[in-house]
Swiss-Prot record:
GO terms for biological process: glycine betaine biosynthetic process from glycine; methylation; one-carbon metabolic process; protein homotetramerization; regulation of gluconeogenesis; S-adenosylhomocysteine metabolic process; S-adenosylmethionine metabolic process; sarcosine metabolic process. Substrate binds at N134, R167, Y206. InterPro entries: Gly/Sar_N_MeTrfase, Methyltransf_25, SAM-dependent_MTases_sf. Catalyzes the methylation of glycine and sarcosine to sarcosine and dimethylglycine, respectively, with S-adenosylmethionine (AdoMet) acting as the methyl donor. It has strict specificity for glycine and sarcosine as the methyl group acceptors. It comes from Halorhodospira halochloris (Ectothiorhodospira halochloris). This is Glycine/sarcosine N-methyltransferase. GO terms for cellular component: cytosol. PANTHER family: GLYCINE N-METHYLTRANSFERASE (PTHR16458:SF2). Its EC number is 2.1.1.156. The keyword NADP does not apply.
Length: 268
């Protein structure tokens, strides 16, 4: 695990557009601040039971949390009665998630994975995979995105579902950044905004009330592009929600949530 609190993006941070760099971005100092950014109580109130209901109405019981972070969704799903395996590419995040789970009376089953080789490190099949917190946008090239979606598809049962979210990068690219931060980033005294945006990079700055500052470099995925990749990998039916609502104007949501079903559907 990293033992540093300092991020390193080199001389020109906007040139860091590498899928493998994200593990270096989640240094101990940033991970320690993450729960200030993701206020658990506020986030639970903002989300309501959206994910729990989406899973329950499909009869899902065995869930892979593919982007565990500090454990918010893993713990919520465990408390709702689901069988959860908690995965992440960051050892620092998994350690924090395990600690958070233990504080709430749960022992998380954690596994460090690289999504591109997911099925090498996890075992069995799942009724659902969740990939939340804008995590999919850490993948900077299409080959990695296709491989990851294929790995997710393979890890699902025949009637399984993938729930994947992303920032509304369409709105940021086309209209600039304007967010009330009413979803996902709910912590008080935390400022989150893009320092640099172009078609190949969204560099977000995270400012905390103690004066500390961190950054994440991510790829600005457009909504319809993500949906197309899902279809091409094999997902049959994809519903996209804007800030947990089925009806929305494309420019309005902070986040999109894609609910992609694997179940094969014959054409009429």
């Amino acid at each position: 695990m990293n033992t540093t609190t300092e991020q390193d993006f080199g001389a020109d941070p906007t040139k860091v557009r590498d899928t493998d760099h994200y593990t270096e971005e989640y240094v101990d100092g940033f991970v320690d601040k993450w729960d200030d950014l993701i206020d658990w109580d506020s986030r639970a109130k903002s989300e309501g039971d959206f994910f729990i209901q989406e899973l329950k109405k499909r009869g899902a019981t065995r869930i892979l949390d593919a982007a565990t972070g500090t454990g918010f969704h893993s713990v919520r799903l465990l408390e709702a009665g689901f069988d959860v395996v908690s995965a992440d590419g960051s050892a620092e995040m998994l350690a924090k998630a395990f600690e958070n789970g233990r504080k709430r009376g749960h022992i998380l089953r954690t596994v460090q994975v690289d999504w591109r080789w997911l099925n090498r490190d996890i075992h069995g099949r799942y009724d659902a995979i969740i990939c939340l917190g804008n995590s999919f946008t850490h993948l900077f090239n299409e080959k990695d995105r296709r491989k990851t979606l294929a790995e997710f598809y393979s890890a699902l049962n025949p009637e399984g579902v993938l729930i994947l979210d992303q920032r509304n990068y369409d709105g940021i690219l086309d209209h600039g950044y304007d967010s009330s931060h009413s979803y996902y980033y709910c912590g008080e005294g935390v400022s989150v905004y893009p320092e640099h945006v172009d078609d190949g990079l969204a560099r977000f700055k995270y400012e905390f009330n103690d004066g500390s500052t961190y950054f994440l470099n991510m790829f600005p995925l457009r909504k319809d592009y993500t949906r197309r990749l899902m279809h091409e990998v094999g997902f049959q039916k994809i519903d996209t929600y804007g800030d947990f609502k089925a009806t929305y104007r494309d420019a309005d949501p902070d986040f999109f949530i894609h609910v992609a079903e694997k179940e094969y559907r014959e054409e009429d």
